[in-house]
């Protein structure tokens, strides 16, 4: 009975040969004492690899009096030659030209909801039917002129539609009213 009544402190201090040679478990990273010290002496903020100093350069497009209509709409209006060149590019890729116009808003807007990411003003009115089988850029330009005569205060855009993949591939503003 005397052997079973032993203090726990006596058991903890007892060690045999196997326990003395055990290595402590891994508890973290290696110490820096074994590695050479190489610190950067230049503390200039421009030398730090971070975009924190460049955040001031990023700006949001101002929505007041600078409406964005389509891709690259911040560029100057297309001349007649540039417009024909864009239409020829559209036709060369085999896309179907289609004209659309908008009499009130020539830009994306919210009208019936305030949900973020949803804009119900994305849809324009189609001018006639898509020009299936059209191979002449001047024919599309003539339709733009006809639409300008019918709606002089409307925005007119040309869409290139791929009827095989059933997607819109290109869209650009062909005419903006003088007020814009």
Swiss-Prot record:
* UniProt keyword annotations, A-Z: Calvin cycle, Carbon dioxide fixation, Chloroplast, Photorespiration, Photosynthesis, Plastid, Transit peptide
What positions does the transit peptide occupy in this chain? 1-56
Enumerate the InterPro entries for this protein.
RuBisCO_ssu, RuBisCO_ssu_dom, RuBisCO_ssu_N, RuBisCO_ssu_sf
Q: List the GO molecular function terms.
A: ribulose-bisphosphate carboxylase activity
Q: Which CDD domains does the record match to this protein?
A: RuBisCO_small
Q: Which domain of life is it from?
A: Eukaryota
| Localisation | Plastid, Chloroplast
Name a GO CC annotation attached to this entry. chloroplast
Record has Transferase as a keyword? no
Q: Which GO terms describe its biological process?
A: photorespiration; reductive pentose-phosphate cycle
Oligomeric state and interaction partners are given as: Heterohexadecamer of 8 large and 8 small subunits.
Question: PANTHER family, from UniProt?
Answer: RIBULOSE BISPHOSPHATE CARBOXYLASE SMALL CHAIN 1, CHLOROPLASTIC, RIBULOSE BISPHOSPHATE CARBOXYLASE SMALL SUBUNIT 1A, CHLOROPLASTIC-RELATED
Q: Which family does it belong to?
A: Belongs to the RuBisCO small chain family.
**Note in the entry:** The basic functional RuBisCO is composed of a large chain homodimer in a 'head-to-tail' conformation. In form I RuBisCO this homodimer is arranged in a barrel-like tetramer with the small subunits forming a tetrameric 'cap' on each end of the 'barrel'.
Functional description taken from the UniProt entry: RuBisCO catalyzes two reactions: the carboxylation of D-ribulose 1,5-bisphosphate, the primary event in carbon dioxide fixation, as well as the oxidative fragmentation of the pentose substrate. Both reactions occur simultaneously and in competition at the same active site. Although the small subunit is not catalytic it is essential for maximal activity.
Q: What is this protein called?
A: Ribulose bisphosphate carboxylase small subunit, chloroplastic
Whose protein is this, by species?
Answer: Stellaria longipes
Organism lineage string: Eukaryota, Viridiplantae, Streptophyta, Embryophyta, Tracheophyta
Gene expressing this chain: RBCS
């Amino acid at each position: 009975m005397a052997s079973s009544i032993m203090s726990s402190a006596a058991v903890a201090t007892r060690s045999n040969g196997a326990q003395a040679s055990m290595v402590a478990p891994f508890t973290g990273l290696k110490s820096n004492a074994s590695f050479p010290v190489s610190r950067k002496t230049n503390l200039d903020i421009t030398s730090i690899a971070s975009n924190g100093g460049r955040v001031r350069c990023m700006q949001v497009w101002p929505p007041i009096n600078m409406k964005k209509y389509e891709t690259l709409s911040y560029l100057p209006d297309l001349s007649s030659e540039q417009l024909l060149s864009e239409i020829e590019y559209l036709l060369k890729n085999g896309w179907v030209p289609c004209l659309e116009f908008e009499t009130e808003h020539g830009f994306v807007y919210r009208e019936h909801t305030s949900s973020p990411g949803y804009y119900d003003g994305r849809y324009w009115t189609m001018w006639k039917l898509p020009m299936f089988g059209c191979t002449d850029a001047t024919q599309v330009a003539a339709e733009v002129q006809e639409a300008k005569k019918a709606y002089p205060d409307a925005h007119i855009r040309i869409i290139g539609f791929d009827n095989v993949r059933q997607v819109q591939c290109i869209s650009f503003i062909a005419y903006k009213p003088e007020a814009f």
